[in-house]
């Protein structure tokens, strides 16, 4: 099991590129970040190479949504651009969201007229279309459930079991789930049993404590037992 750190959220007292050096000093194997289209990717690549780190993942979404069938073609085309960047950077994974988030991380367009079943089928169709593209690129798209109670009201994929179900239906080694312990503790709890029962479809795990999304050990979660179960 390798460790990576999201430098959007950690070491924020330093300039962005300097956070890579701080991550190496802290003993991480790799870094993560969110959007790629507003960053100097060659500079990031040079900095991680110099620090001896990898890029574990970054966000695939460039806008658009998986939940509306009329947006599927443009969404898939945008993800192809991200897959190309992942290949250039040597990143094995990219985070994939079902909805478009604004700068404040809220869902921009919720499409309540569609209903949950139509959204589900649209997401399934989009993932099915993305699977061969991800396979060809050698990159894994990790679908991320988020909480709708504290952070992202209106987000479609707010339960882990729906993500597991979708990924199993697509049945591709390059479409997996990102299980974020913070988000799913807020929504459903039962972290250890959920993790250990679905490791076949989980590619990536994010850690933070509840409440507040702070460092492990600052809240209600028993991270010693969670990490023991993962190992």
Where are these regions (language model features)?
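Short alpha-helical linear motifs
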Residues: 101-104, 220
